[in-house]
Amino acid sequence: MKDSEFHALVEGRYQFIEQAIDNCDTDIDCELNSGVVTLTFVNGSKIIINKQEPLHQIWVATRENGYHFDWKDGKWIDNRGGRELIELLSDACSKQSGEKVTLG
């Protein structure tokens, strides 16, 4: 994959995440700054999402764990657990907010 394709895929996913957070009923602050998305919850916990250009990966840090996502078959898939990015983020947001969150 070329770097330009990677950046376009990541930016598209970041836009989707921002829109999904804005549309959910749970109070989550979503901030994009210098290629890093920070989700901040009322309890002060955070989820950090950033891109790793040299590896062509998206990395996610939650309160419980860290995840590395590769682009496979049209989806961002965790390279250890095999979960899709938005599915994993929905579960992580639910755990950190204490409310059911569905992002996709």
Curated annotation (Swiss-Prot):
GO terms for biological process: iron-sulfur cluster assembly. PROSITE patterns: FRATAXIN_1, FRATAXIN_2. InterPro entries: CyaY, Frataxin/CyaY, Frataxin/CyaY_sf, Frataxin_CS. GO terms for molecular function: ferric iron binding; ferrous iron binding. GO terms for cellular component: cytosol. Keywords: Iron, Metal-binding. Involved in iron-sulfur (Fe-S) cluster assembly. May act as a regulator of Fe-S biogenesis. PANTHER family: FRATAXIN, FRATAXIN, MITOCHONDRIAL. Belongs to the frataxin family. This is Iron-sulfur cluster assembly protein CyaY. The lineage of its organism: Bacteria, Pseudomonadati, Pseudomonadota, Gammaproteobacteria, Aeromonadales. The gene is cyaY.
